[in-house]
Amino acid sequence: LVGNAPGGAGLECQFSGPTLRFQRDAVVAVTGADMAPELDGMPAPMWRSFTVRAGQTLALGFARLGARSYLAIAGGINTPPVLGSRATFHQAGIGGMEGHALKKGQAVPVAESADGAEGRAGRQVIAARRPPLTGEKNWQIEVVPGPNDDWIDEAGHARFLSSDWLLQ
């Protein structure tokens, strides 16, 4: 949506998002869980690239449906790759923004877009191509047998696979 190269870094926001004040003009896109993005307190689009001007504030709230939103900024977040990835691995303290989640007041380094991003505003993912996000709470998940699945007899496997489960 913003024209970044494959492997360009963005922000993954789990359950709630940040409030970001932009120091320069940028083209951004928010996808994934609906975190009701707002630009200077007004609703901002999801699944569509749009321009944020220097001094404006983009805020992502709490996820209404889904768990994770993704914020892409034209040019990409400019962090060094670690083990071939720009992702943050919190438990190991590596990658991303010095191995930790963003902190209040921390500047996010954004690379310059190679060919200027202004013309990319307005691109969108059509509704038919977006993953379905519904309030449905009954999910069918796949099970992969583990290395000790032979500890359970055939009747136990059948009972496990035919039962309804409540995840808490």
Predicted regions, residues:
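Conserved "landmark" site that anchors the functional core of diverse proteins
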Residues: 1-168
